[in-house]
Amino acid sequence: PAAAGAEPQRLVDINEYVVRGNTVLDNRAIEAAVYPFLGPQRSLGDIEGARDALQAAYQEKGYQSVYVELPEQQVSGGVVYLQVTETTVGRVRVVGAKHYSPVELREEVPALEEGKVPDFAQVQRELAQVNRTPGRQVLPMVREGQRPGTMDVDLQVEDKNPWHASIGLNNDYSADTRHLRSVVSLGYDNLWQLGHAISLTYFTAPQDQDNAKVWSGSYTAPLSQRWSVQLSGYQSDSDVATVGSMNVVGQGHSYGVAAIYSLPVTGLWSHSFSFGVDFKDFEEQTRIGGNNDRVPIKYAPLTLSYNGFRYTERSQLALGLSLVAGTGSLLGYGDDDEEFDRKRYRAKSGFGVLKGDLNHTLTFGGDWQVATKAAFQLASGPLISNEQFAAGGATSVRGYLAAENTADDGYLLSQEWRTPSLGRFLGKRAGGYVNDWRFYVFAEGAQLRLQDALPEQDDDFSLASVGIGTRAQLADWLSGSLDWAFPLLEGTNTDKHDSRLHFSVQASF
């Protein structure tokens, strides 16, 4: 009886949807959206479904400023009209830029073209590329335009001075050298207002610079939105003791060039590939007792690398994979197999190395963190010392000396369990100077293998340690860490259960 009083729903035959006002979607995309809602005996719900499907098609393509309406009409001849309203970009301004050119920033977001319907998915991809530059963040602010049917966009810029410098001190030393190490770096990230970056670093042992003295630098020049080229190199002059009375005096350099291709950002991932060549020339002198033996080597390996990054609110992941190939004298530069064999028994100039690394930090509820670090190297055969995998030290296996063991193949695994940051509790009480301060426990180890070892050589090395530590970031410029590590295995230069303290402090400006 109640249903009997209800007005029956009107059904119509729909043969065609006519879309008015569209300039951005092609006919195929429109047909795919509305096709399921064609046919006989269709209701108002079907017509509204066609409108919603078309609206979703615009959204999927990134056209967030497009709205699909169903105007009042009498359906006749099986034709239904849908009206599309497209809001175009009116005026675009760059606001707040202090150290970067507003003109250059504007040109880096071409998807916001005045007078055009913006593809906001493309806008986000372009902004993600813009925001890869250190010390610069650009956010779009959209508001109603001054002209009807338009929107105005402000690109809000927060940028820092592209000049940056740092000075650090630590005790990550190698065998038979003085204990302190210092590093000073200087860089500029926006040369010529084109985003070119240059950096220079000096690393030394301040108590005796003959122990370690290394100059390094790099220059990166963007060529387009995706391509860039990087020049890099270092000059080394050091006296590092290795085993017993044998000292290796290292003087040499490496200069390289690489092309870098940054892939479009996909979801939370950003990826890049690089391909380059390094020209290496090392002149080492080995002293055993009163005898000197000069073992110079020159070679030019090719390197193909992949780097991937994934950042979320609670997870940060970085991946790296590289394939290094020795070229012999293919490029007209470098020593032959005889010279490589003289430096290392059975080493070849045409060597191959596959190496990789992973860093992952996961934040749980209550701000607890777990951090994982892993690295590996696989070699095609015996390698000269410059290309070997090293383990031990403050950034590798704590509790051991820096590069305590080196070998052709190896892997490393480190795990840290971190407390919540005390910065959120002490920040205001300490005048806002404590940004982050955590304590942690860690366990880490490495396994290394020497290929074709000589009869008197060990061919297998294992390192493992556990410990506790703390790391802090004070204000925006001072950071430091202190680790107490307990070696679980005997090392070449470290006794089992002989604990060691590692410290590091760095000031950044």
Predicted regions and their residues:
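Transmembrane beta-strand segments of outer-membrane beta-barrel domains in Gram-negative
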Residues: 228-385
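Transmembrane beta-barrel domains of outer membrane proteins
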Residues: 156-158, 187-189, 218-222, 232, ...
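Transmembrane beta-barrel architecture of outer-membrane proteins
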Residues: 53, 125, 150, 181, ...
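Transmembrane beta-barrel strands of outer-membrane/channel proteins
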Residues: 142, 167-171, 184, 198-204, ...
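Repeated loop/turn-to-beta-strand initiation elements of outer-membrane beta-barrel proteins
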Residues: 163-165, 192-198, 225-231, 266-271, ...
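C-terminal transmembrane beta-barrel domains of outer membrane proteins
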Residues: 340-509
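Solvent-exposed loop/turn segments connecting transmembrane beta-strands
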Residues: 172-181, 203-213, 405-408, 489-498
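Periplasmic polypeptide-binding modules associated with outer-membrane biogenesis and secretion
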Residues: 1-173, 203-213, 354, 374-375
